């Protein structure tokens, strides 16, 4: 039985994960941490992260970027593996994640779904053929009107996958409104749509002369992210210090 601390337990994803874990015979949430104790939980909730002394095997984080620094310090102090699902981290925070991974196991993924992580592999193979042949690469992401960050962490992760396949020769453009020039050959455009209750949609476009190839992933429920986070927590518990991602979970 893997014992989990849920950081951001009163948020939507925290509640989704709590519901899923209740039905999981191999995992248990033993404590929650959130700025407000407004969730419907069967476990104790702490509004101050340092007040949580509950013994656990791993922590799952679905909170906000502003809480990331204190969270990482807390996990290092307790030698607690962390599944970091929060997006919108600054460059300084991303650097801190890498430093933290030298001390404890850290699994960071912008998107926890099996489908998205499979898509990342597919588009890398496509990029090696199509981008090399001169196809332009664009990403369009769509999310609900309440999402705070743009582009989404998943869109940036998809862009990173494309760029990695092309030896990091590309740069990203997410705003063309102030530019009066044609598209650069070595850019990956990223466009964001916000509206309604869209859970998450990501489209990767390879646009060539007289032909277009599109890869698309649509999330109909946030439960897919919760399931992935739980599987990641089970995988990470007991692992040595290091930087992990969902590819490690998928490969076992």
Where are these regions (language model features)?
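C-terminal substrate-binding/catalytic lobe of Rossmann-fold NAD(P)-dependent oxidoreductases
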Residues: 7, 12-50, 132-252
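Rossmann-fold NAD(P)-binding glycine/threonine-rich loop
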Residues: 73, 77, 86-106, 117, ...
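Rossmann-fold dehydrogenase core element
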Residues: 81, 96-113, 130, 135-136
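Hydrophobic beta-strand scaffold residues
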Residues: 29, 45, 82-83, 106-108
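Extreme N-terminal starter segment of soluble prokaryotic enzymes
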Residues: 1-5
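An anion/phosphate-binding loop that grips the pyrophosphate of nucleotide cofactors and donors
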Residues: 56
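Rossmann-like NAD(P)H-binding beta-loop-alpha module
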Residues: 118-134, 150
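N-terminal Rossmann-like NAD(P) cofactor-binding module of classical short-chain dehydrogenase/reductase
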Residues: 59-60
């Amino acid at each position: 039985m893997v014992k989990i601390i849920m950081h951001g337990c009163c948020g939507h994803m925290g509640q989704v994960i709590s519901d899923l874990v209740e039905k999981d015979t191999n995992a248990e949430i033993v404590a929650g941490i959130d700025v407000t104790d407004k969730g419907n939980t069967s476990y104790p909730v702490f509004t101050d992260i340092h007040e949580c002394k509950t013994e656990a095997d791993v922590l799952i984080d679905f909170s906000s970027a502003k809480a990331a620094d204190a969270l990482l310090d807390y996990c290092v102090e307790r030698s607690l593996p962390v599944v970091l699902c929060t997006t919108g981290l600054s460059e300084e925070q991303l650097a801190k994640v890498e430093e933290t991974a030298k001390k404890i196991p850290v699994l960071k993924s912008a998107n926890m779904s099996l489908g998205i992580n499979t898509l990342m592999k597919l588009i890398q193979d496509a990029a090696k053929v199509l981008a090399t042949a001169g196809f332009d690469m664009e990403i369009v992401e769509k999310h609900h009107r309440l999402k705070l960050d743009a582009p989404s962490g998943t869109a940036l992760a998809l862009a990173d996958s494309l760029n990695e396949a092309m030896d990091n020769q590309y740069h990203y453009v997410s705003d063309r409104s102030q530019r009066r020039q044609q598209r650069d050959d070595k850019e990956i455009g990223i466009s964001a749509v916000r509206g309604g209750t869209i859970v998450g949609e990501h489209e990767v476009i390879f646009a060539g002369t007289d032909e277009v190839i599109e890869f698309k992933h649509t999330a109909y429920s946030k439960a897919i992210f919760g399931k992935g986070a739980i599987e990641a927590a089970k995988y990470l518990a007991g692992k040595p210090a290091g930087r992990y991602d969902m590819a490690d979970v998928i490969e076992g």
